[in-house]
From Swiss-Prot:
UniProt keyword GTP-binding, yes or no: no
Entry similarity comment: Belongs to the class I-like SAM-binding methyltransferase superfamily. RNA M5U methyltransferase family. TrmA subfamily.
Name by which UniProt lists this protein: tRNA/tmRNA (uracil-C(5))-methyltransferase
EC number: 2.1.1.-, 2.1.1.35
Encoding gene (name): trmA
Active site: 324 (nucleophile), 358 (proton acceptor)
Matches recorded under Pfam families: tRNA_U5-meth_tr (PF05958)
Function summary: Dual-specificity methyltransferase that catalyzes the formation of 5-methyluridine at position 54 (m5U54) in all tRNAs, and that of position 341 (m5U341) in tmRNA (transfer-mRNA).
GO biological process entries: tRNA methylation
Length: 366
């Protein structure tokens, strides 16, 4: 695979290899055959970041080879959305011969949606001034004249200039209902939107008929908690990053959801609060004891669950675990399988043609 060529003819083979690998890893805990969810074979990534290389009068996107660290010129990127590919060409054309926008530009980040909106961030090793803003506004207007629905942001050390806004609103069809998700530049969002829809629909399927309330740790912009709200009486979700919490609050309102509460708190802190180890001002007005948590949802970072959170989640009858790293999932399952058994197992091909796998498990108390 090269940045400008995807081996689409190998898609089925690489997916089959992942299925075998996941089954092998899960064998100590379950003999289930994974439910498999396929990605589009190209144009599946909704975000991409590129370094910018200055080569005489020329200017182009590059990435670095992970093994050799050599730079690779990238003029098109079929893994990314068609909108990103259009913008890559348009941005280079707009910046190449503009001294103000070009000078000390070292990176461009792209974030797009299925609803065809984009935020493009230009990163600089220089101070950004009014002249930069004027030139950036002219570029933005020129891009919009090409029917590109784009917002531009300039970034430098301790500086962020958003010409209009630093977010876009994604609209996803999820099990017959349109969900609106505000996505903020430089905050985590699911990279593969088509796969995200399938993950949300799978999570809805495995939790249908649920009783009681849902607790979610690491909720981000509310991606899962808002979609799952229809299956539960109430949802309480935690998130530590301020921009993600703000986006989640917006998304609650935008989707007319009235049974979800988001609190800004680390998973480890929430564990302490639930165990009565310490009190938090942030929980004032929230009666934790009034919740009947029957299901806990976790979508942890690549490092998986820490040992304290492992112990905490074992207290719940059902654990829904989405993992971006099956190795740490299996490490967590060494503990969780003492009290819970695997009821459902899914493989989501979030990153085709790479070693990475995303998977989901539903665990129920033995």
């Amino acid at each position: 695979m090269t940045p400008e060529h995807l081996p689409t003819e190998q898609y089925e083979a690489q997916l089959a290899e992942k299925v075998v690998r996941l089954q092998s890893m899960m064998a100590p805990f379950s003999d289930l055959v994974p439910e498999v969810f396929r990605s589009p074979v190209s144009h599946y990534r909704m975000r991409a970041e590129f370094r910018i290389w200055h080569d005489g009068d020329d200017l182009y996107h590059i990435i670095f080879d992970q093994q050799t660290k050599s730079r690779i010129r990238v003029d098109s990127f079929p893994a990314a959305s068609e909108l990103i590919n259009q913008l890559m060409t348009a941005m280079i054309a707009g910046v190449r011969n503009n001294p103000v926008l070009r000078h000390k530009l070292f990176q461009i980040d792209y974030l797009t949606t299925l609803s065809n909106q984009a935020v493009v961030s230009l990163l600089y090793h220089k101070k950004l001034d009014d002249e930069w803003r004027q030139e950036a506004e002219a570029l933005r207007d020129a891009l919009r004249a090409q029917n590109l629905n784009v917002h531009l942001i300039g970034r430098a050390t301790k500086t962020k200039i958003a010409l209009d806004q630093d977010y876009i609103d994604e609209r996803l069809p999820v099990a017959g209902k349109e969900m609106i998700y505000r996505q903020v530049e430089n905050s985590f969002t699911q990279p593969n939107a088509a796969m995200n829809i399938q993950m949300l629909e799978w999570a809805l399927d495995v939790t249908k008929g649920s009783k009681g309330d849902l607790l979610e740790l690491y909720c981000g912009n509310g991606n899962f908690s808002l979609a799952l709200a229809r299956n539960f009486d109430r949802v309480l979700a935690t998130e530590i990053a301020k921009p993600s919490v703000a986006a989640a609050q917006y998304n609650i309102t935008a989707n007319h959801i009235d049974n979800v509460q988001i609190i800004r708190m680390a998973a480890e802190e929430f564990t302490q609060a639930m165990n009565g180890v310490r009190e938090f001002n942030r929980l004032q007005g929230i009666d934790l004891k009034s919740y009947q948590f029957e299901t806990i949802f976790v979508d942890p970072p690549r490092s998986g669950l820490d040992s304290e959170t492992e112990k905490m989640v074992q207290a719940y009858p059902r654990i829904l675990y989405i993992s971006c790293n099956p190795e740490t999932l299996c490490k967590n399952l060494e503990t969780l399988s003492q009290t819970h058994k695997v009821e459902r197992l899914a493989l989501f091909d979030q990153f085709p043609y790479t070693h990475h796998m995303e998977c989901g498990v539903l665990l129920t108390a033995k």
